[in-house]
């Protein structure tokens, strides 16, 4: 069984899917896939073009937003991931090799819109442990506050920001 970890009602993370796993992603109700794993990363896995074809064969919208571990905190990388979160149909499944980079990128985006500790709490509730990055999340968010992308981002609000990014409340 393919592992999918729900972070919010509209966003989940997981490891690199194999070809057969795109059916499981669709059957789990996901509408889109974000691939964070670069094509030149070591290991045996699907290249982005192959993953896109498999996703589209299942009726899934596909986005390629590659980042290696060293580029996670670059503003362009975070902006690209945020655009995918805004533009893709929901719910979204995001992956890298293990799901950790996808989780960190989600937290970086969420921290632009709410307190980093709340994003960390959502990930902790989903079984992810990235609390050690709270200072980095806060610093990254401070770099973009007030930027044109943040100020004109009505699309993020209209898609239900609280559902995608979490509202910081635990049930």
Task: Describe the function of each predicted region.
Residues 1-92, 104-171:
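Cys-dependent protein tyrosine phosphatase-like superfamily
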Residues 96:
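Short cysteine clusters
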